Every structure is written in structure tokens, then in C-alpha cells.
Amino acid sequence: MACCVARCCSVPTGPATTICSSDKSCRCGVCLPSTCPHTIWQLEPTCCDNCPPPCHIPQPCVPTCFLLNSCHPTPDLLTVNLTTYVQPGCEEPCVPRCC
């Protein structure tokens, strides 16, 4: 499996008392700690297919097919701001692109 297939994600690495500053996305499948000050996660990973979650909106993982294929049941996506991140190469970080 090519390393570029990996998703971006945010994963907390400490207890809820950890002092945080800002969210970080990962490169080529390497997950960095979630450092979002607005949401507290108790050692529970938060991720989505191709983008780090916004700090102020806690979201479950949503498969891409739910967003692109209308024949699947649609989850509650009313408050989700969709941003697509593209990894052009294994050495490049995820780059935001307009939908």
C-alpha cells in the first residue's frame, strides 16, 4: 500500500488536562496530537477521510461515500463545514483545496 493513501487525522495523546494551542494535521499517515483548546477528547481519536476536524465542531468519522454518493443514507451533516485536503505526494503535507 502506498504511503500517500493514508488519511489526515488528529489524535489526542494525553488526558483532558493537557494545555493545547491549535489543531495540527498529519503528513503521510503520521498523526500528530490534537491540540485544539475548544474541545476536550479523552484519548479518543477524531478523524475524517481527508481533513482535520474543525476545532469548534466535534464530529464523528464520516466515510467519503456518504458525502459523494446520494444512494447512501446521509448522516447529520447540517453543521459540517466540508473542506477537502489533497496529498500530492508522500513528502508533501495535506494542502487545502476548494471544493
UniProtKB/Swiss-Prot annotation:
Transmembrane segments: none annotated. Keywords: Acetylation, Keratin, Repeat. Residues 3-59 are annotated as: 3 X 5 AA repeats of C-C-X(3). It comes from the Eukaryota. The modification N-acetylalanine is found at residue 2. Signal peptide: none annotated. InterPro entries: Keratin_matx (IPR007659). It holds the Pfam family Keratin_matx. GO terms for molecular function: structural molecule activity. One of its GO terms (cellular component) is keratin filament. Sequence repeats lie at residues 3-7, 8-12, 47-51. Belongs to the KRTAP type 3 family. In the hair cortex, hair keratin intermediate filaments are embedded in an interfilamentous matrix, consisting of hair keratin-associated proteins (KRTAP), which are essential for the formation of a rigid and resistant hair shaft through their extensive disulfide bond cross-linking with abundant cysteine residues of hair keratins. The matrix proteins include the high-sulfur and high-glycine-tyrosine keratins. Interacts with hair keratins. This is Keratin-associated protein 3-2. It comes from Mus musculus (Mouse).
